């Protein structure tokens, strides 16, 4: 991928990230509320955008940043994908 395309994607992702984060912050739902699932979906989208930015950032791919992104995505996804124990896989990223 050339630098122009990479920079365009990153610029669009920053806009998408700002909109997603603002929507998340405006959602006042708490665990157990009817809107909780929607708030968690917004958080998952936010983390997916962080993964995109980590993946396309200039230089070497940061293993620590990638682990952090995947940990968050797996942890949040665990509540949407049942019977696969994604949280266990997330925790395994940081176990010896």
Identify what each model region corresponds to:
Residues 8-19, 43, 47-50, 72, ...:
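Charged, amphipathic alpha-helical oligomerization/scaffolding segments
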Residues 65-96:
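Amphipathic alpha-helical binding modules
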Residues 2, 27-41, 55, 59-66, ...:
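Alpha-helical rod/repeat scaffolding segments in eukaryotic adaptors/tethers
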Residues 48, 55, 96:
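Functionally constrained cores in energy, signaling, and assembly domains
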């Amino acid at each position: 991928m050339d630098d122009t395309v990479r920079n365009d994607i990153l610029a669009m992702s920053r806009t998408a990230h700002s909109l997603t984060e603002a929507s998340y912050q405006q959602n006042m739902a708490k665990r157990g509320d009817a809107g909780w699932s929607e708030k968690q979906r917004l958080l998952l989208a936010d983390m997916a955008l962080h993964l995109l930015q980590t993946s396309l950032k200039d230089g070497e791919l940061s293993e620590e940043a990638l682990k952090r992104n995947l940990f968050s995505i797996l942890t949040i996804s665990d509540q949407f994908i049942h019977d696969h124990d994604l949280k266990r896989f997330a925790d395994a990223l940081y176990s010896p």
